[in-house]
Amino acid sequence: MAYVSMKQMLETGVHFGHQTRRWNPKMRPYIFGARNGIHIIDLQQTVKLFRIAHDKVVDIVAKGGKVLFIGTKRQAQEAVAAEAGRAGQFFVTNRWMGGTLTNFVTIQKSVDRLKKLESMFADGSINRYQKKEILLLERELAKLEETLGGIKNMDRLPQIAFIIDPHREDIAVKECRKLGIPIIAVTDTNCDPDVIDYIIPGNDDAIRAIKLFVAAFAEACMEGEAMGKDHKGETANAEEAMQKAAAVEAAAEAAPAQ
């Protein structure tokens, strides 16, 4: 288990919340105190709650589930795209398109368009168009890739969402809740924890803090995937052993009595 330690959280500034005047009173249970007008988050709770969320991700991925990483703020975009991609999971780092989850069928039509354009540029069939048309199609492809590139292989809804800053990603939160998709979120002191299933109280603005959590959940995904493969291997071996035993038993029954 690759848990994040309290030392790592302190070093990356996870404990720094927002200004005390910019807070959601519902976050009071997760606040240790205040210093120079800034709320300080109780990292003992963050460590405990992180482990719960981490184990949930491992379990879901081990059972064949997928995670959707969401982080459209500038500080999160690079880390979310890199780490989710490394773990083979889905991600949204540009603007969240309303209906990405709740209007999944319609979004898939745009994804199909993206894949078609990619194919046309890859196999050279795009060259049957005039240069001006090709330029327009290049721009369309770039825009679709920017918006949908991280979910173009998402052929079904994710089993869980991991969100950086649920206050900013409120539309994504609403869509997940409407569809019953559990939410894990790095939740700063200005957020509403009531709409999050697995809250991780922490700084959702500092790049180092964001990278710490995103990388940790990418590792959780890969750990779950490895566990799933091991389980499939064990199941296959058990089934093979049962088949061999059945064959031996059948052969023994078919043999003439001495």
UniProtKB/Swiss-Prot annotation:
The keyword Transmembrane helix does not apply. GO terms for biological process: translation. Residues 234-258 are annotated as: Disordered. This is Small ribosomal subunit protein uS2. Transmembrane segments: none annotated. Pfam families: Ribosomal_S2 (PF00318). GO terms for cellular component: cytosolic small ribosomal subunit. InterPro entries: Ribosomal_uS2 (IPR001865), Ribosomal_uS2_bac/mit/plastid (IPR005706), Ribosomal_uS2_CS (IPR018130), Ribosomal_uS2_flav_dom_sf (IPR023591). Keywords: Ribonucleoprotein, Ribosomal protein. Residues 236-258 have a biased composition (Low complexity). Belongs to the universal ribosomal protein uS2 family. PANTHER family: 30S RIBOSOMAL PROTEIN S2 PROKARYOTIC AND ORGANELLAR, SMALL RIBOSOMAL SUBUNIT PROTEIN US2M. GO terms for molecular function: structural constituent of ribosome.
